[in-house]
From Swiss-Prot:
Protein name: Flagellar hook-basal body complex protein FlhP
InterPro entries on file: Flag_bb_rod_N, Flagellar_basal_body_rod_CS, Flagellar_FlgE/F/G, Flg_bb/hook_C_dom, FlgE/F/G-like, LlgE_F_G-like_D1
UniProt gene name: flhP
Organism: Bacillus subtilis (strain 168)
Classification via PROSITE patterns: FLAGELLA_BB_ROD
Residue ranges of coiled coil: 7-65
């Protein structure tokens, strides 16, 4: 009984993590540029009990199954980032951009640290360093970086802003022109991305991404006046949620039954 209760308890913890992941996916189904996480389970190391007669050749030949008794000790959940391209929704807003390549991310400054996002809903806010300039930021107020790692500061006199498919922002007032190459990276291994919340990611392994500068900027796929929607499949997430809830109930029932059996043993006189 104790073994079954411990096994169920281990699995319950992993199932709760799966439910939390699914809940996060569903709550972000309308978040711009959000990438869903997929979950799966694998069996933990099994414990084997050998039998006394397992080395007996006659017994071994007569068996239809492998010798010994193998008992599981629970399951472990793992998750991976789903990097599939989300649908593109046209907004006709000059500061909205959508990546058309599934592995490219915009560089932003988060409290002095460089992080990455696919949320292309951008805004301008008065620059703290220069009253005559506007700073390009994300919806959460994080400064967008250019290809050199500097913030994008646009003169407040500029009225027209265009962003081409290679990530070059051009601002003009009819006479003067400013150009900025937005900082974009190509992620070679999306599983190296570490979620930091607020639709942001960090990367510890420098070999997992490549900065698209110089001639490589022609590989950037960006569309102005559009936003990439979340790639969450709601029907799939709801199906997984129901399945995980049923598994949670079954494992909870296992613990309850084990407790009842222990209670019966304690009541024996």
């Amino acid at each position: 009984m104790l073994r079954s209760m411990l096994t169920a308890s281990t699995t319950l913890n992993q199932l709760q993590q799966q439910i939390d992941t699914i809940s996060s996916n569903l709550s972000n189904s309308n978040t711009t540029g959000y990438k869903a996480k997929d979950t799966n389970f694998s069996e933990l190391v099994r414990q084997q009990f050998d039998q006394v007669d397992e080395k007996n050749e006659e017994v071994a030949k007569a068996r239809k199954t492998p010798p010994g008794l193998r008992l599981g000790v629970g399951a472990m959940m793992s998750s991976r980032l789903v990097s599939d391209q989300g649908s593109i929704q046209k907004t006709d807003r000059d500061l909205d951009i959508a990546f058309t390549s599934p592995y490219q991310y915009l560089q932003v400054n988060v409290n002095g640290n460089r992080q990455y996002t696919r949320d292309g809903a951008l805004y301008v806010t008065p620059s703290a360093a220069n009253a005559n300039q506007l700073q390009l930021v994300t919806g959460n107020g994080y400064p967008v970086l250019d290809e050199n790692g500097n913030t994008v500061n646009i003169d407040s006199s500029m009225k027209n802003i265009t962003i081409n498919k290679n990530g070059t922002l051009t601002a003009s007032d009819g006479n003067a022109v400013q150009r900025f190459n937005l900082g974009v990276v190509q992620v070679n291994n999306p599983q190296e991305l570490k979620s930091e919340g607020n639709n942001l990611f960090s990367i510890d392994n420098a070999a997992a991404f490549e900065e698209l500068n110089g001639a490589n900027r022609q590989n950037i796929g960006m569309q102005q006046g559009s936003l990439e929607m979340s790639n969450v499949d709601i029907s799939e997430q709801m199906t997984d949620l129901i399945t995980s809830q049923r598994s949670y109930q079954l494992n909870s029932r296992t613990i309850t039954m084990g407790d009842q059996m222990l209670g019966l043993i304690n009541s024996v006189r």
